[in-house]
Amino acid sequence: MAKMHTKRKGKSSSTRPNRTEPPEWCKIGADEVTTITLDLWKQGVSTSEIGMILRDRYGVPDAKLVTGKKITTILKENNVAPNLPEDLTNLIVKALGLRKHLSTNKKDVHNKRALNLTESKIRRLVKYYKQEKVLPRDWFYKPETAEMMITR
């Protein structure tokens, strides 16, 4: 769960059902899900968007239930996985946008705070990914070189 940077309590959301096998009405097979996933990835669709497309267009409630593997695992097995996790990439893109905004609007204190909070999230996430050995031990976030990391 993410750190709350506010006094509010957050909002409730629904929980996913406890299932170990796909529902009977899901007629698509594991091979089809794998090929669809790889095709969508080649078109430039992110992993979270692949999951939503599988859900909305193909009626697959959860790719892991059908294939037994997560979408990123499918991509890793086919040697096309991204070098950075998607949530970290999204936070870095957000921080880059805030930095660009602050370069022209130097007195925008609210977005200075937003940048500070976003970069704190990035540092916490990097620390987690280093512990889980997703990122190498010598990897660290530098705002100056962040744009080059994202475009690679």
Curated annotation (Swiss-Prot):
Entry GO CC: cytosolic small ribosomal subunit
Keyword Metal-binding annotated: no
One record GO biological process: translation
Domain of life: Archaea
Residue stretches of biased makeup (Basic residues): 1-11
Swiss-Prot/TrEMBL keywords: Ribonucleoprotein, Ribosomal protein
Region (Disordered) location: 1-24
Assembly with partners or alone: Part of the 30S ribosomal subunit.
Protein family per UniProt: Belongs to the universal ribosomal protein uS15 family.
Annotated protein name in UniProt: Small ribosomal subunit protein uS15
Gene: rps15
